[in-house]
Amino acid sequence: WYYLHLFAAEQPDFNWSNADVHEHFRTFLRFWVERGIEGFRVDVAHGLVKAEGLPDDELGPDRWNIAGSPDEDTAHEKLPDVGPAFNQPGVHDIYREWRRVLDEVGQDILLVAEAWVPTEADAAQYVRADEMSQAFNFPFLGAGWDADALRRVIDVSLSEYGAVGAPATWVLSNHDVVRHASRLAYPADMDTDPGIGPKDPQPDAELGLARARAATLFMLGLPGSAYLYQGEELGLPEHTTMEDEARQDPLWERTNHLIPGRDGCRVPLPWTRDGASYGYNATGRTWLPQPEGWGEYSPQAQEGCDDSTLTLYRRSIALRRKLGLGRGSVEWLDSEPGVLLLRNGTTAIVLNTTEQPVTIEGVGRTLITSWRRSETDESDAANTVEAAGAVVVPPNGACWLDDSAGGTDGGDPR
């Protein structure tokens, strides 16, 4: 005999055709809510129910990468959009059942779906009023450093989630992908999905951090909910030079050491500049090795520094709340190619993905910027709002501008 497991052999899948499984999870939900839990993140939320009869998947779990976009003419275009193990219609019955259980306790309990489904429309099905609360927006994460792709995802997400009465969400990193402080340093055609190892091309750390700070500031300017992955507030990069013998991701073992896997984004956080584990624990031993110099990213190293990534996160989150951006809306303004410019309430949000500075005309004061003073000359106009009512946004930069007068204009690149 055997049991079905979509992932590691140590993780057998539950049989959701068994009534006892449903009762087990109803009890589980009540147990934790009674102890004060306010929400649940559901891992692989699209993978609970399997197609009847458990048919084989001709392409396997990576069918979307192999088959291409549903809009493309591929050799596999006649296959279903999803494999028999994922995104089956019956999965929604389970979440309706869970929602009923949680509604019975009389509290607003959050259910968040980690669902790697093909489109935003598919993801929106999980957050209908009688199902889950929110779903991670992985198309936004996958849009990369591409202004057109980002705008498309934003528009489609706001439309699809809005159609079911749910807030849009935004995310740039998680435990399954290369950290965006490293991922965004690569060219668009660089596939980082399998992870990055010491034999792969190494990212430009300075470029990656500049883009990561800009992408985060832009994301926090959008309406909806923004999700942060532990360590990104420190500007942590991927550990790309981890020794092979230290890797623990099952993907590494199951692929005969061909795929580096996800260990690089799961390295324990640094808390102090120095120490055997940079303050992570008292023993100095960690399950994954921390790279040399990890302490320079620690909160201890960044506290009190106006230019630090930690300070940027704290200030932008506080300002986002003060300005009510999470409950706002998106109005796109004219801008040059490669530049995203939108109005959210009385705030203009700018992202420059190009390699040239861009001038934004008709602005009020600058509220916050992603770039550090060390990245521009002290006399550079990018550091200040020009007297003529314009601001220069440097390459790979983002900022928020006071647009209460409604005069912001994309202007010309320079």
What are these model-derived regions, one by one?
Residues 1-363, 367, 371-414:
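Active-site and adjacent substrate-binding regions of carbohydrate-active enzymes
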